[in-house]
């Protein structure tokens, strides 16, 4: 179990208890599906995946959550509403704290992972509520499984949440919304590195793994009318 990163709000007890049951189950299911579908695919890529999307709010400048909007809860509820607009009914949005949210996208088409983040960030960038509160939106996501050998211990689900956080914290944004995602790279088939080795390395230095093609890092570019 990984330690909580510095300056990150801990997961409330109710959310923690839910994730301790739900997320390991979904990870195991994603592992089994990947092993079955990749065995039928010429490039051993999974037909579906699990998307872990971490949404974080931060002040562009000044104080956290300035006064005019009547408190934190309205902004937090607004972010949850934005998430529900871009995910399906079968997906799960979770409020980790007022500043941080998690969305678990089940049985996701790997080609659709980028679109989900792009749509959400476009809506966040256009939000009058977030604009009035002077807040920036960051999204980091992990497309699971990351390896053709998906053997990551599912009880260590917090590590994957931490990895999504790490992706949300990449680079210094210039606008009101930014996002980065992590997914398996083209060299993964040849390497066959198991997730039990890959994911701890990714948490320390995803860029090094991306340079050798074991992983890919996607940067979300906002487009008009997305």
Residue ranges: model-predicted function:
Residues 1-38, 43, 75, 199-223:
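PAS-family sensory modules
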Residues 29, 45-52, 62, 158, ...:
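C-terminal output/effector regions of signal-responsive regulators
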Residues 117-122, 138-141:
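Active-site/pore-lining binding-face segments in mid-to-C-terminal subdomains
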């Amino acid at each position: 179990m990984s330690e909580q990163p510095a300056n990150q709000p801990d997961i409330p007890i109710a959310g923690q208890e839910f994730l301790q049951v739900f997320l390991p189950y979904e990870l195991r299911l994603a592992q089994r599906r990947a092993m079955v579908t990749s065995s039928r695919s010429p490039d051993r890529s999974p037909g579906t995946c699990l998307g872990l999307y971490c949404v974080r709010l931060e002040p562009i400048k000044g104080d956290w959550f300035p006064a005019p909007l009547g408190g934190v809860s309205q902004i937090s509820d607004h972010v949850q509403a934005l998430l529900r607009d871009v995910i399906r009914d079968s997906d799960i949005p979770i409020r980790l704290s007022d500043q941080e949210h998690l969305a678990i996208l089940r049985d996701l088409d790997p080609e659709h992972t980028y679109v989900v983040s792009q749509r959400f960030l476009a809506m966040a960038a256009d939000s009058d509520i977030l604009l009035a509160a002077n807040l920036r939106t960051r999204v980091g996501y992990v497309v699971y499984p990351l390896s053709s050998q998906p053997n990551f211990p599912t009880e260590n689900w917090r590590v994957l949440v931490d990895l999504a956080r790490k992706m949300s914290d990449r680079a210094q944004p210039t606008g009101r919304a930014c996002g980065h995602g992590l997914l398996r790279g083209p060299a993964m088939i040849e390497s066959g590195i198991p997730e039990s080795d890959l994911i701890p390395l990714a948490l320390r230095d995803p860029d090094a793994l991306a340079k050798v093609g074991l992983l890919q890092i996607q940067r979300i570019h906002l487009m008009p009318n997305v």
